[in-house]
């Protein structure tokens, strides 16, 4: 039985040195009045470092300066069955382009991972709001050199069915949205997905894999425009405590633009947040992520799959790529609560459920709402450590369980959703 185990060992001295060098940025980080809270009574990892290494504590408060940028950096080493030992450096940049009423926080998130199995993982995710909130700019750029496990199509596969594949991957997705009404934006963009050096490394001998049956080619290209309708009433996307998010995205892939084939995809995503109890800082969060493909045949590696959303977070409790199919339905709920009243430590409990189009319907290209495989649930719990009390960036460490013996640790800089 393959068990997905991921353990991160943090490097406090390096983390502390990076964060203390950023304290000048912290002290000038100005929280807009509509987002302000009593930061003097809140504590984060930088405050802990100050209390240990500084004789005289320097209050980190709003100075009213124009600079409103904060950087959180997290170096770590990790281990998983999929990566072996890995060196990881994550960074989260949060800032406001203005202090007007209703101004949203802008974020830039990146990391670099190099693993024992010579995997390279380099994502860059941006969510930038203009000064007046009229425009929103989103980017999802990734480069991967990624030997990894795949398990076939549908949700009736077993962990023992997994085998290694290898490929290189470049994703460049860019989108710009314009405000239509309050919190409502319409947008368009351009997507490029390029795979090369695709190969199977350890398939069962004498058995044709789902990958081969579906279509295994050494190179795959998908190019096309994207059209989106976005509603976002959250004020802080790093650690939301209220508001909601709804994204409807249509992405056709077109041969005349350079795609290998014509096909289409539709994404319907919802996130909602509510304080519970209402007078507390505890939050109930709900996430629904649903992807559908139609009008052609997507590459195997671009089919909806566990853990392949833009933030690589669906399916806690399951290894990335555990399930795959033409269509995907996903639902997750999480309860976030304080452990310490100063906000330094928190906790979560979560549960999720996912289903995909079955193997035969995906292979035959006739998937519909009637051809979904059995639902696969997951659940777990985690801790939160406040890295920055101004941007509300948390270090998130979760342990999840899934069906069929799946289990593992998930680590994030910023909330999972």
Segments (PLM) and residue ranges:
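C-terminal hydrophobic structural anchor segments
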Residues: 339-378
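Short, contiguous acidic/charged loop-to-helix segments that flank catalytic cores in large enzymes
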Residues: 318-324, 365-373, 400-401
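Residues on the lipid-exposed face of transmembrane beta-strands in outer-membrane beta-barrel proteins
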Residues: 75-77, 89-93, 124-128, 172-178, ...
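Short loop/turn motifs that connect adjacent beta-strands in outer-membrane beta-barrel proteins
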Residues: 57-69, 97-105, 131-136, 182-183, ...
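C-terminal outer-membrane beta-barrel translocator/porin domains of Gram-negative envelope proteins
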Residues: 236-345, 350
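Gram-negative/organellar outer-membrane beta-barrel architecture
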Residues: 63-73, 77-221, 321-322, 392-407, ...
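Transmembrane beta-strand segments of outer-membrane beta-barrel domains in Gram-negative
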Residues: 24-60, 140-142, 148-283, 356-360, ...
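Bacterial Sec-dependent N-terminal signal peptides
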Residues: 1-28
């Amino acid at each position: 039985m393959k068990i997905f185990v991921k353990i991160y060992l943090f490097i406090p001295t390096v983390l502390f040195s990076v964060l203390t060098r950023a304290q000048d940025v912290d002290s000038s980080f100005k929280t807009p009045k509509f987002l302000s809270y009593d930061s003097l009574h809140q504590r984060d990892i930088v405050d802990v470092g100050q209390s240990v290494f500084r004789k005289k504590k320097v209050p980190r408060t709003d100075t009213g300066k124009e600079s409103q940028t904060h950087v959180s950096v997290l170096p770590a080493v990790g281990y998983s069955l999929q990566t072996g030992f890995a060196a990881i450096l994550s960074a989260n940049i949060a800032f406001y382009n203005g202090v007007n009423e209703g101004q949203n926080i802008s974020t830039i998130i990146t990391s670099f991972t190099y693993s024992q199995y010579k995997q390279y993982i380099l994502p860059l995710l941006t969510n930038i709001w203009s000064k007046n909130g009229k425009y929103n700019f989103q980017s999802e750029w990734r480069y991967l050199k990624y030997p990894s496990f795949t398990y076939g199509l549908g949700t009736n596969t077993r962990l023992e069915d997994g085998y290694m594949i290898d490929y290189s991957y470049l994703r460049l997705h860019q989108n710009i949205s314009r405000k239509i009404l309050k919190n409502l934006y319409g947008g368009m963009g351009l997507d490029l997905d390029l795979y090369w050096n695709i190969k199977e490394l350890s398939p069962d001998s004498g058995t044709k894999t789902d990958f081969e049956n579906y279509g295994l080619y050494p190179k795959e290209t998908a190019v096309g425009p994207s059209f989106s309708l976005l509603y976002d009433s959250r004020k802080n996307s790093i650690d939301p405590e209220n508001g909601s998010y709804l994204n409807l995205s249509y992405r056709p892939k077109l041969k005349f633009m350079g795609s290998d084939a014509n096909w289409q995809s539709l994404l319907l995503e919802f996130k909602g947040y509510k304080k519970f109890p209402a007078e507390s800082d505890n939050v109930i969060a709900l996430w629904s992520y649903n992807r559908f493909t139609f009008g052609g045949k997507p590459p195997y590696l671009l089919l909806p799959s566990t853990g392949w959303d833009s933030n690589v977070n669906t399916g806690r409790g399951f290894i990335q790529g555990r399930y795959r199919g033409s269509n995907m339905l996903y639902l997750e709920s999480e309860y976030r609560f304080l452990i310490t009243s100063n906000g330094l430590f928190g906790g979560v409990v979560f549960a999720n459920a996912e289903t995909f189009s079955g193997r035969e319907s995906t292979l035959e290209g006739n998937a519909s709402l009637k051809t979904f495989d059995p639902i696969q649930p997951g659940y777990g719990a985690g801790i939160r450590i406040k890295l920055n009390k101004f941007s509300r960036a948390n270090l998130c460490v979760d342990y999840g369980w899934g069906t069929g013996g799946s289990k593992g640790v998930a680590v994030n800089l910023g909330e999972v959703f």
